[in-house]
């Protein structure tokens, strides 16, 4: 009978676990641990719910007697909130010891990932969005909430379940098969609280601590864009290399301390020293100070005890009617601001030896054993990102893609005037430790197969190893790289150079994450941004289904029309329509074409029609790969001649989809890349599109393959690849104007030398003409680019929430075609294409000849110098000119026509080089500033000449006009 007592207690305390459904995977991973009796320390709590009075009750959430088998094990267990009506958590009491537990996290959600008594957290924490309510580590004392403040749970809007995550770092305490029932006790009340508590997490995800480095700083900063919050407690968290963590509110340049603490002290939630309120427009800033002394290899951010973390938890309350339960900051939007951070943030806090409570598994011996695992090649985010998930703070990092995570490394030992130059842009890579594969893909930044299941699952942050590949600090300025590093970068051809327009105030607009930029028919800049929404690791689950629907659509205008001269907002729209904006294009009629990666849809919007979208492609919130669905589509291009719609689809699919002007599916092409050398037509995140109507080509920024691929719009045949080592591993966006192709790359990977920057290329041969960077701020994740035909370029950055304007040092129309890097041959080819199209469809032999002229462009190892090419081109012209003048002089003497002006072929030759010859090199048409469509090939079908070419009727139509492509047969659909 006595032997049955433990079994009866199990049934009484955890009756639901006996009836719960268990997946085969979860049963396999539990090693029969649930069949063992609880240890004596687990028998103290036989009633998980204990009434306190008529309105209050206590809830005991404990692990059900678990025995971890290996270090860095993460176990999760769930408990349903015992009341259906709304309740409020007003107190927490930890039930754990540092002897067995590294740290604990308590989440609130509506559906846990498992219904078993407990499970490995790599199976997921919650299937929906999870909000962190409490975090504990290092024998921290209880957290006390102010009177009238509570975490809202239950009811229609609150969480239905608590999910406890426990990280067991060292398992030496379990060598004798001891069991653990660590957890947390909650005090809840049914009485409504006027103030609702929440958590603001500031977290670095890609800091690298070099071995032997005495001081390494990791900085985090974000703009606060919400209703006022009142900070009442904070908690810092690093592993054993952390010396001090400081958090501040920055308002009008003034730094106000939120909290500063040594992470080697008990990691409790400490009360703030004085009341701190944070209002809309303030900046929140945090700095973690690390040391790499004593290490023989670099230390990265990650989930194991041998890795590091840089987290600042800010506990706050807000008025109930405006309350937001969880907010995050994983960026550094104002790195230069840290030059004025109070000196105290750089001073470690002394800790007495008896106060330092470290696990034995923090010893260097075990650290060295684990390092090789962290040095395996990893893939980049993305947010991903890629990125990182805020939950990694606590446990493990998630990979993030496109527009989400970055950290700047700051060295305070350098002189103040050079501090801003030491800001490092770090590309982080997050990948599951046992995947054993390397794959570049961002934001967030998706991995395919098992990697996708790990990274995009917002709560699948356990048993992941976050390995970072940061670049070394480099100077972000307009200068050439040191000798040997920049052999790929050509000298500026002549005086052709892009420079930031330093007098343009648009750089200070500070919208949300800038995902798209375009130019409308009036040459106004149009910005597509995400407002207060961000794409991070908890945005999507493993099936790419958006997880933050409860936040609702973005409540501010997401489309801004900006005056290109003074950056004034002329018009705004897009409120309550989008969740995660991405691509923006504008067609020849001024319609906006946008994509939303959360909705998995493409929208056509008439800026003058306030009644809603004109056309919608895809199914709302339904990812897919058939003719009626998209999966995180990235960009749209519309052919100005045929009206054909091209969609790059996208992060989950690897294809280009074509639709008719009415939205009927026509065809698709492309497939996922395989291997390290992707073939033509293979993509890894087709991220940006640029149409070249004149040549009938569609170019694609194959982002994670670091290249540009061009295809024929009529046959979908691969034409060529543009790839340079200076691109690095990513090409984020491209934009085309006649003769030129513009592009921006992404953050460098660890060990790479290529910085993030903009490129100008000769479209005819793909050679780089110019490389440029901003002066004010710096590129972090330049997400989109658009160029106008006068050479003005705008670039939007998804991390710094910034838009830059760049202009040419001189007007192109006053520059020789050689100086601009555009060859006469390209113009002649374009003229031939246009003339042929206007007369008849090209024959197959003609198409073959045209294809032969456009060879596959790889970066040349050695090429003919530009000066030599220019000389070879100029010599025949000079000789022809001399012969013509001599003949004319002889004729003048023979016939006495000394007053006759030169009207011969020599004049026509000169006319061609001045852009005045009919059908010649019309630079005025190529580069004159006029109202047109310059976003990604939306070129105006104009028959007007510029002011300097009015006498040359038809010259512009010959160069700009592209006859509509023949309609595809209905069978192709």
UniProtKB/Swiss-Prot annotation:
<feature type="binding site">
    <location>
        <position position="651"/>
    </location>
    <ligand>
        <name>a protein</name>
    </ligand>
</feature>
<feature type="binding site">
    <location>
        <position position="584"/>
    </location>
    <ligand>
        <name>Ca(2+)</name>
    </ligand>
</feature>
<feature type="binding site">
    <location>
        <position position="582"/>
    </location>
    <ligand>
        <name>Zn(2+)</name>
    </ligand>
</feature>
<keyword id="KW-0560">Oxidoreductase</keyword>
<feature type="disulfide bond">
    <location>
        <begin position="76"/>
        <end position="121"/>
    </location>
</feature>
<feature type="disulfide bond">
    <location>
        <begin position="109"/>
        <end position="126"/>
    </location>
</feature>
<dbReference type="GO" id="GO:0001519">
    <property type="term" value="P:peptide amidation"/>
</dbReference>
<feature type="disulfide bond">
    <location>
        <begin position="631"/>
        <end position="652"/>
    </location>
</feature>
<feature type="compositionally biased region" description="Low complexity">
    <location>
        <begin position="962"/>
        <end position="973"/>
    </location>
</feature>
<comment type="subunit">
    <text>Monomer. Interacts with RASSF9.</text>
</comment>
<feature type="topological domain" description="Intragranular">
    <location>
        <begin position="31"/>
        <end position="863"/>
    </location>
</feature>
<feature type="disulfide bond">
    <location>
        <begin position="699"/>
        <end position="710"/>
    </location>
</feature>
<feature type="binding site">
    <location>
        <position position="103"/>
    </location>
    <ligand>
        <name>Cu(2+) 1</name>
    </ligand>
</feature>
<feature type="repeat" description="NHL 5">
    <location>
        <begin position="766"/>
        <end position="809"/>
    </location>
</feature>
<feature type="region of interest" description="Interaction with RASSF9">
    <location>
        <begin position="925"/>
        <end position="942"/>
    </location>
</feature>
<feature type="region of interest" description="Disordered">
    <location>
        <begin position="937"/>
        <end position="973"/>
    </location>
</feature>
<feature type="glycosylation site" description="N-linked (GlcNAc...) asparagine">
    <location>
        <position position="762"/>
    </location>
</feature>
<feature type="signal peptide">
    <location>
        <begin position="1"/>
        <end position="20"/>
    </location>
</feature>
<feature type="transmembrane region" description="Helical">
    <location>
        <begin position="864"/>
        <end position="887"/>
    </location>
</feature>
<keyword id="KW-0812">Transmembrane</keyword>
<feature type="binding site">
    <location>
        <position position="102"/>
    </location>
    <ligand>
        <name>Cu(2+) 1</name>
    </ligand>
</feature>
<keyword id="KW-0443">Lipid metabolism</keyword>
<keyword id="KW-0186">Copper</keyword>
<keyword id="KW-0472">Membrane</keyword>
<dbReference type="Pfam" id="PF01436">
    <property type="entry name" value="NHL"/>
</dbReference>
<feature type="binding site">
    <location>
        <position position="783"/>
    </location>
    <ligand>
        <name>Zn(2+)</name>
    </ligand>
</feature>
<dbReference type="InterPro" id="IPR036939">
    <property type="entry name" value="Cu2_ascorb_mOase_N_sf"/>
</dbReference>
<feature type="modified residue" description="Phosphothreonine">
    <location>
        <position position="943"/>
    </location>
</feature>
<feature type="propeptide">
    <location>
        <begin position="21"/>
        <end position="30"/>
    </location>
</feature>
<feature type="topological domain" description="Cytoplasmic">
    <location>
        <begin position="888"/>
        <end position="973"/>
    </location>
</feature>
<feature type="disulfide bond">
    <location>
        <begin position="288"/>
        <end position="310"/>
    </location>
</feature>
<dbReference type="InterPro" id="IPR011042">
    <property type="entry name" value="6-blade_b-propeller_TolB-like"/>
</dbReference>
<dbReference type="GO" id="GO:0030667">
    <property type="term" value="C:secretory granule membrane"/>
</dbReference>
<keyword id="KW-1015">Disulfide bond</keyword>
<feature type="binding site">
    <location>
        <position position="703"/>
    </location>
    <ligand>
        <name>a protein</name>
    </ligand>
</feature>
<feature type="region of interest" description="Peptidyl-alpha-hydroxyglycine alpha-amidating lyase">
    <location>
        <begin position="495"/>
        <end position="817"/>
    </location>
</feature>
<comment type="similarity">
    <text>In the N-terminal section; belongs to the copper type II ascorbate-dependent monooxygenase family.</text>
</comment>
<keyword id="KW-0847">Vitamin C</keyword>
<keyword id="KW-0765">Sulfation</keyword>
<dbReference type="GO" id="GO:0004598">
    <property type="term" value="F:peptidylamidoglycolate lyase activity"/>
</dbReference>
<dbReference type="GO" id="GO:0005509">
    <property type="term" value="F:calcium ion binding"/>
</dbReference>
<dbReference type="GO" id="GO:0005576">
    <property type="term" value="C:extracellular region"/>
</dbReference>
């Amino acid at each position: 009978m006595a032997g049955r007592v433990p079994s009866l207690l199990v049934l009484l305390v955890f009756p639901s676990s006996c009836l719960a459904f268990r997946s085969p995977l979860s049963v396999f991973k539990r090693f029969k641990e649930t069949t063992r009796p609880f240890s004596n320390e687990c028998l103290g709590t036989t009633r998980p719910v204990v009434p306190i009075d008529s309105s209050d009750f206590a809830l005991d959430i404990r692990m059900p007697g678990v025995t971890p088998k290996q270090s860095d094990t993460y176990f999760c267990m769930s408990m349903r909130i015992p009341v259906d009506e709304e309740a409020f958590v007003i107190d927490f009491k930890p039930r754990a010891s540092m002897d067995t537990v590294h740290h604990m996290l308590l989440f609130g959600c509506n559906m846990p990932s498992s219904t078993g008594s407990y499970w490995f957290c790599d199976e997921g924490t919650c299937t929906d969005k999870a909000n962190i309510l409490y975090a504990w580590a290092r024998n921290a004392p209880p957290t006390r909430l102010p009177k009238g403040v509570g975490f809202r749970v239950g009811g229609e809007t609150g969480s239905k379940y608590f999910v406890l995550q426990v990280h067991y770092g060292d398992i030496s305490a379990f060598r004798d098969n001891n069991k653990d029932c660590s957890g947390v006790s909650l005090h809840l009340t049914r009485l409504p609280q006027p103030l609702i508590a929440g958590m603001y997490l500031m977290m670095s995800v890609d800091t690298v601590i070099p071995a032997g480095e005495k001081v390494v700083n990791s900085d985090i900063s974000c703009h606060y864009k919400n209703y006022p919050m009142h900070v009442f407690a904070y908690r810092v968290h690093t592993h054993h290399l952390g010396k001090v963590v400081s958090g501040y509110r920055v308002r009008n340049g003034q730094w106000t301390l939120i909290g500063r603490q040594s992470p080697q002290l008990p990691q409790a939630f400490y009360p703030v020293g004085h009341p701190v309120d944070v209002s809309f427009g303030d900046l929140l800033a945090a700095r973690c100070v690390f040391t790499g002394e004593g290490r023989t290899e670099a230390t990265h951010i990650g989930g194991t005890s041998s890795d590091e973390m840089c987290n600042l938890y800010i506990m706050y309350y807000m008025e109930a009617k405006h309350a937001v339960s969880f907010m995050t900051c994983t960026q550094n939007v104002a790195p230069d601001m840290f030059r004025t951070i109070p000196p105290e943030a750089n001073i470690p806090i002394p800790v007495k030896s008896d106060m330092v409570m470290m696990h034995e598994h923090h010893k260097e011996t075990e650290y060295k054993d684990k390092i090789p695992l962290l040095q395996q090649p990893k893939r980049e985010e993305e947010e991903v990102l890629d990125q990182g998930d805020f939950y990694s703070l606590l446990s493990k990092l998630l990979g993030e893609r496109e527009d989400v995570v970055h950290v700047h490394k700051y060295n305070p030992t350098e002189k103040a005037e050079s501090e801003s130059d030491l800001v490092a842009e770090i590309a982080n890579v997050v990948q599951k430790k046992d995947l054993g594969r390397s794959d570049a893909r961002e934001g967030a930044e998706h991995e395919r197969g098992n990697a996708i299941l790990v990274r995009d699952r917002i709560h699948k942050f356990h048993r992941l190893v976050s390995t970072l590949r940061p670049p070394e600090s480099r100077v972000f300025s307009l200068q050439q790289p040191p000798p040997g590093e920049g052999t790929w970068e050509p000298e500026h051809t002549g005086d052709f150079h892009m420079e930031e327009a330093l007098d343009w105030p648009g750089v200070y607009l500070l919208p949300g994450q800038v995902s798209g930029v375009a130019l409308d028919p009036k040459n106004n800049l149009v910005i597509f941004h995400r407002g207060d929404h961000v794409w991070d690791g908890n945005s999507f689950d493993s099936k790419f289904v958006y997880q933050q629907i409860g936040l609702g659509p973005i409540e501010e205008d997401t489309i801004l029309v900006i005056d290109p001269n003074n950056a004034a907002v002329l018009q705004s729209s897009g409120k309550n329509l989008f969740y995660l904006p991405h691509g923006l294009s504008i067609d020849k009629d001024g319609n906006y074409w946008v994509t939303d990666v959360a909705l998995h849809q493409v929208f056509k919007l008439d800026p003058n029609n306030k009644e809603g979208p004109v056309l919608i492609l895809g199914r709302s919130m339904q990812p897919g790969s058939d003719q009626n669905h998209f999966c995180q589509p990235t960009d749209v291009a519309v052919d100005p001649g045929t009206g054909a719609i091209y969609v790059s689809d996208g992060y989950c699919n690897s294809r280009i989809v074509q639709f008719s002007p009415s939205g009927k599916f026509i065809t698709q092409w492309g497939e996922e890349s395989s291997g390290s050398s992707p073939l033509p037509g293979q993509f890894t995140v087709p991220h940006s599109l640029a149409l070249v109507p004149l040549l009938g080509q569609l170019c694609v920024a194959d982002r994670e393959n670091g290249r540009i691929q061009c295809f024929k719009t009529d046959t979908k045949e691969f034409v060529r690849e543009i790839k340079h080592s200076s691109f690095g591993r990513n090409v984020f966006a491209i934009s085309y104007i006649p003769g030129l192709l513009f592009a921006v790359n992404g953050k460098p990977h660890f060990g790479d030398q290529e910085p993030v920057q903009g490129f100008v290329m000769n479209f005819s041969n793909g050679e780089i003409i110019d490389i440029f960077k901003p002066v004010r701020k710096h590129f972090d994740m330049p997400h989109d680019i658009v160029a106008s035909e006068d050479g003005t370029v705008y670039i939007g950055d998804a991390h710094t929430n910034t838009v830059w304007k760049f202009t040419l040092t001189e007007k192109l129309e006053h520059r020789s075609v050689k100086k601009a890097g555009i060859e006469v041959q390209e113009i002649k080819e374009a003229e031939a294409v246009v003339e042929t199209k206007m007369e008849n469809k090209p024959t197959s032999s003609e198409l073959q000849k045209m294809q032969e002229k456009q060879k596959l462009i790889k970066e040349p190892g050695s090429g003919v110098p530009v000066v030599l090419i220019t000389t070879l081109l100029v010599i025949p012209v000079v000789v022809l000119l001399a012969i013509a003048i001599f003949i004319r002089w002889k004729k003048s003497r023979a016939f006495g026509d000394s007053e006759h002006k030169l009207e011969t072929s020599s004049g026509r030759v000169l006319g061609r080089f001045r852009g005045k010859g009919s059908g010649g090199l019309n630079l005025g048409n190529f580069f004159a500033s006029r109202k047109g469509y310059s976003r990604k090939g939306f070129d105006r079908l104009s028959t007007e000449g510029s002011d300097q070419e009015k006498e040359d009727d038809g010259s512009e139509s010959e160069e700009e006009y592209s006859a509509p492509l023949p309609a595809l047969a209905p069978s192709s659909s």
